[in-house]
Amino acid sequence: MSTTQRKSFKNQLKRFNNETSGSTNSTNSNASPELTSLTEMFPDWESDELNSLLQEKRNSLEVVIDLIVNNKVSKWEPIKKEKKEKKVKDDTDGFQANNTTSSTHLGSQSGKPFNKFKSSNKPPRKQGNVTKKPIKSTSDNNKPTTSTSNGAEKSKESSASGSWASALGEDTAKPATSKNTKPTTELEKAPEQDSNKDETPLESEQKQQEPQEQAEQKPKTTASATTTSEPAPKPVLKEAVIPSLNQGSWASAITPKTKPKPKPKAVKTAPSPTQATEPAQQQQQQQQSEQSEQSEQPEQPQTSQADQNESVSKPEEPVVSESQTSAQEKTLEIQEPVASAAAPAAQAPASSSSAVEAGAQGPQVVLPTSLQGVNSVGISFGSLSLGEEEPKDSHKDLREQFDQTQQKYEQPQEQPQPQQQQQQQAQAPAPSQQQQQQQQRYDLYEQQPQQSTNYQQQPQQPQQSQQSQQPQQQGQGQFGKHASQQSVPSQGQVPQQSQPTQQQYDYYSQFQQQQYPQQAGQPGAQFGGYPAYDYSAFNQQAYAASPANAHAATTGSAAAYNQYAQQSVGAADSTQSPVSAQNVLQQQQAQQQQQQIPTPFGYPYYNYYYNNPYFGGAGGLGNNGFASANTGSIGQQTQQGAQQASQQLNVPSATQPSGVSANGFGAQQQYYNPNQYSNRYPGYSYPPQPQQQQQPGQQQHQQQPGQHAGQSATGSESDAAQQGQGQGQGQQSHPQSGAPQQPVVPQYGAYQQYPQYGYQDTTQYRGGWY
């Protein structure tokens, strides 16, 4: 912010004693957690600026982060340079005191010309930002990289210090580091070194010495890798690496965390090709590290050492050191230096050349891959779209590298890393696998848990097999997305995908047979609970099995249907019912259970509308078994079936004087007796049957809840009339039809009895013809 503004803000905040140099320290000591987290997240920003921003935004951390990340706010460049000088000194101290201080300030500011440092600082506010990196490359290759590397490391350290902002802010890498760092002690060691770096960032020799000591700790890998990488790479790497370093800024924080440690076998040999490929490899590593962080790998110790390695190698030679570290890690990761190096080398030179050609694009080349990793984390930097700008070739290379890295990262979770390397070798030759892996990458974010389980379960399998398996798990996502890219193993998925779904659709048939035990015994009466409704034949298995037979519209007559109809519960004893022979006790028990049940309100349900005789025409009544109950017994129905069909269609026969009307499905009334619902549902009473006019009191009585049970199941409507007259108590005295009297049990055959909801039957959903 302009000094005037800043001062005004500072004056508002008395706690900042020195506006310039003291500010960082004072902010560190006095700073609110929001400020510290912001400084960690945006090391380029000075704590003064961040503080003033926070004050403006009422200490709303989210708002400030949003503003900064979306470039809605920009730092005040011109005046800061001086302050940075003062701050740099203090920053190193402050940073040591508080690991949380902005990381990049410290390293870069300490030794570098401030204008350069600023130029590097300005754009990168977005940690992902490309601009930050190219500027650094322009300003001072070594120093800016050191600043970034230091910043990244510091951010790592700060992440170790543990504010969530540091975890988020220093890229996904930090969270990974905090998670991955085996003991914080190692991180502490690294921070100490970093602080040393901060103090004398330019004293690369001391740094080299320290890192070498650390390298001794990490003995073979870092020292040899650093040594090998140092001599050759500097000239080449500075150009090619700078873009990779651009990755290095926040990505670099992420990268070392990859599993490099296990691969201490570092391919020190062939350093030149690997180094040439380093930008690509670094990208890979960054991706790996990001992804490894995402799938927080068990190899945490490795990652922590990797972090130390980074810290070591970075200090040695700021530009080269980072590239070296990445090179080391990559060499570690890529023991097949030549084989994989050849493929990445081809890729890397393309990417590096594009990066070198466009210094600004260089970071872009690096970023998209790492950004993909970031996407999986869910953190989005403004630069996510950079990949679009890149030349397609570099994009392909990046994706391949990204694939390789993710393969590394995917497999290594449980696999020994040598396998990873071998697999990488295999992968480099096989672009098709990489494509699969890319697809897997994209789907990976959706399905990582599955994949992780895969790897854990099958740690040792070569990636081809794993790939084949991953596509199988991912196949659903991939088929939608990348079906064209999928290779054969993913196609293997198809049966697997289809298989699990098959079971899902049986749903109701299962219930019909299993969960509603009553159904088997007396399916027809399941609706008996509805007053004046005789559903006796409705749910018969035969009927359900072949709805064509049972459906009113399809059946020629009551007689035709009666063969299928279960005996009406009321009229015929369930013992006679084809479905189940029940002894008297069972019947009685059923009666008792179902009489106790309050009258369900069933009318809104499927069967009322679709199975009622209206659709079959009243003629279908007997056929549905709704009217068939009227006959009293199926035997009678079958005997009388044709007669009844005609009679019910026309007028209830003398034998069934009120029979049809009692059901409410009299042939003469298209739908419902006025009383069918005992007038509980007055809207549904339709033109009264002449006979029901006789019965209305009766039926209404019958359908009083106490009596409804009796009537609902009453085998014959004549009985229903009788019951309405006084037998409605749920016991038919005797069906007038002379059918064997079945105790009037409103049998909710298929009904699960949900007292609140009425009896809900699967048959509601599986109507005989559905």
Curated annotation (Swiss-Prot):
Question: Which residue intervals are annotated with compositional bias (Low complexity) in the record?
Answer: 18-32, 158-167, 220-231, 267-306, 335-361, 404-476, 484-530, 586-595, 632-648, 668-684, 691-713, 720-749
What the entry lists under InterPro entries is as follows:
CUE, DEF1_CUE
PTM comment = Ubiquitinated.
Q: Where is the CUE domain?
A: 30-73
For this UniProt entry, which residues form the secretion signal? none
The residue ranges flagged as biased composition, category Basic and acidic residues, are 74-92, 185-219, 392-402
Compositional bias (Polar residues): 95-122, 136-148, 175-184, 573-585, 649-661
Q: Which residues does the annotated region (Disordered) include?
A: 1-43, 74-361, 382-530, 567-595, 632-749
Alphabetically, the GO molecular function entries are: DNA binding; ubiquitin binding
Describe the function of this protein.
Answer: Recruits the ubiquitination machinery to RNA polymerase II for polyubiquitination, removal and degradation, when the transcription-coupled repair (TCR) factor RAD26 fails to efficiently displace stalled RNA polymerase II. Also involved in telomere length regulation. Binds DNA.
Put simply, this protein is called RNA polymerase II degradation factor 1
- Species of origin reads Lodderomyces elongisporus (strain ATCC 11503 / CBS 2605 / JCM 1781 / NBRC 1676 / NRRL YB-4239) (Yeast)
Q: Which gene encodes it?
A: DEF1
